[in-house]
């Protein structure tokens, strides 16, 4: 194990990785096993965007957006994002919501408010946070940091299967191209580029089942002397 941090009364496990690496599913199952809270950081931005539309707040009204983010009632469970107690998992995937998320995230105070909300998810008995910069930016003191990797081909196949199961049509070659382009953007961006923390455990899930990936994360957690 790379981490030698002592027991933390409110431990955080971060699970970062590229698109379709399986981080969301693994994080949800680890959280369920440990009885920890769950944070889907990517969905948080979309939830704020959806709420801003529903409450009629303009994308340029920074003060109102910050207050909205501070007051949002958000809950994450396996495969489910709730806003004010209502499942909005499908609503936040709409293209218009994604566009609004991009529009509000350009404001520094809005980003700061969203970072604060992410950190506020750290509550007893613990938190599992998934995203792209959880271990490097949001929770640099996490007791366990995991960075999931997988080949672009494996991730494209997973995303294709997910879309087909939800009734959407998709071309696997297009998905593969899009993933590679996004990987390049995420890895080379100036602010918080997608990369593992120096003390992260690397987990290649290309040939692993979900259960195998979850078991490995739990093994690492137990090896730190943490109850699991």
From Swiss-Prot:
Cytoplasm in keyword set: yes
Keyword field contains Transferase: yes
A matching Pfam family: Cytidylate_kin
Binding residues annotated for ATP, in chain numbering: 17-25
One biological process term in Gene Ontology: pyrimidine nucleotide metabolic process
Annotated catalysed reactions: CMP + ATP = CDP + ADP; dCMP + ATP = dCDP + ADP
Keyword vocabulary terms for this entry: ATP-binding, Cytoplasm, Kinase, Nucleotide-binding, Transferase
Domain of life according to the entry: Bacteria
Enzyme class: transferase
Localization per record: Cytoplasm
Family: Belongs to the cytidylate kinase family. Type 1 subfamily.
Protein name per UniProt: Cytidylate kinase
Gene: cmk
């Amino acid at each position: 194990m790379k981490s030698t941090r002592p027991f933390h009364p409110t431990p955080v496990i971060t699970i970062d990785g590229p698109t379709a690496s399986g981080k969301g599913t693994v994080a949800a199952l680890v959280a369920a096993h440990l009885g920890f809270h769950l944070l889907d950081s990517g969905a948080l931005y979309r939830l704020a965007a959806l709420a801003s539309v529903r409450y009629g707040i303009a994308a340029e009204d920074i003060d109102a957006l910050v207050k909205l983010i501070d007051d949002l009632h958000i809950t994450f469970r396996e495969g489910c994002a709730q806003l004010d107690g209502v499942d909005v998992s499908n609503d936040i995937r709409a293209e218009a919501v994604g566009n609004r998320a991009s529009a509000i995230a350009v404001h520094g105070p809005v980003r700061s408010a969203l970072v604060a909300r992410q950190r506020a998810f750290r509550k007893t008995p613990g938190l599992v946070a998934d995203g792209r910069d959880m271990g490097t930016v949001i929770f640099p003191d996490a007791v366990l940091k995991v960075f999931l990797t997988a080949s672009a081909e494996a991730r494209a196949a997973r995303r294709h299967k997910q879309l087909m199961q939800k009734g959407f049509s998709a071309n696997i070659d297009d998905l593969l191209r899009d993933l590679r382009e996004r990987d390049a953007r995420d890895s080379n961006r100036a602010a918080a580029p997608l990369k593992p923390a120096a003390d992260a455990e690397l987990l290649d899930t290309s040939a692993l089942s979900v259960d195998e990936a979850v078991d490995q994360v739990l093994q690492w957690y137990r090896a730190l002397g943490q109850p699991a």
